[in-house]
Regions:
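RNA/tRNA-interacting regions in translation and RNA-turnover enzymes
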Residues: 1-200
Length: 200
């Protein structure tokens, strides 16, 4: 089977670019029962590469916490599309849909038999839908606008945020999974300003 784990100190992997690197115990890898097959979220390994002789493939559709990969690629002198994408963050809710779509396309174009899905996830799954404490009164103060509560809610909900009014003065707002860039009240106010216009 395929697992995701931390590398053993001194473990080595030959990457797709031909470079062999020595890993430390802070590096996340995708591995089989013997050794790493990929530097997680950065680059695949040469010994698991697809060739013209390949008959069986294993598709990876992953989410890695940006903090787990931050700086790892650069520390090995690597910069890949994958490392850039994962360091910036990807939607953690799309993995299964993406895997199903890719599998369907491969099956349609190339034929073949589709195998089972296996999942590797940590014991403690990261909670991604942290509610943001939001004071609606801050919107008009910061933006110089005169928006009503219903205007603010309409703006947020149009961007797929979930709003719960705990009281008139304090709301909780949960970002959609694809908006991992929204972390604080100021980010929400910026989104409202962008939608409603800063000169209202």
């Amino acid at each position: 089977g395929i697992i995701v784990r931390m590398a053993a100190a001194g473990e080595k992997i030959e990457l797709l670019d031909g470079k062999t690197i020595k890993l430390n115990s802070e590096v996340l890898v995708v591995a089989d029962h013997k050794s790493p097959v990929a530097l997680a979220g950065i680059m695949g390994g040469e010994h698991s590469a697809v060739t013209s002789e390949t008959e069986d493939i294993f598709l990876e559709s992953a989410f890695f916490e940006p903090i787990a990969l931050a700086g790892v690629a650069r520390s090995y002198g690597l910069q890949t599309d994958a490392s850039t994408r994962f360091e910036r963050g990807v939607d953690p809710d799309l993995q299964l849909d993406a895997l199903e779509r890719a599998t369907a396309l491969i099956s349609e174009i190339c034929g073949g038999e589709i195998g089972p899905v296996s999942c590797s996830s940590p014991d403690k799954v990261m909670k991604l839908d942290h509610p943001i404490q939001f004071r609606p009164s801050s919107v008009n103060k910061r933006l110089g606008t005169n928006l009503s509560s219903s205007d603010i809610i309409r703006n947020l909900e149009s961007l797929f945020f979930k709003v719960t009014q705990r009281s008139e003065a304090l709301w909780e707002v949960v970002s959609p999974s694809f908006r991992f860039d929204i972390r604080a009240e100021a980010d929400l106010i910026e989104e409202i300003g962008r939608l409603s216009g800063y000169d209202e």
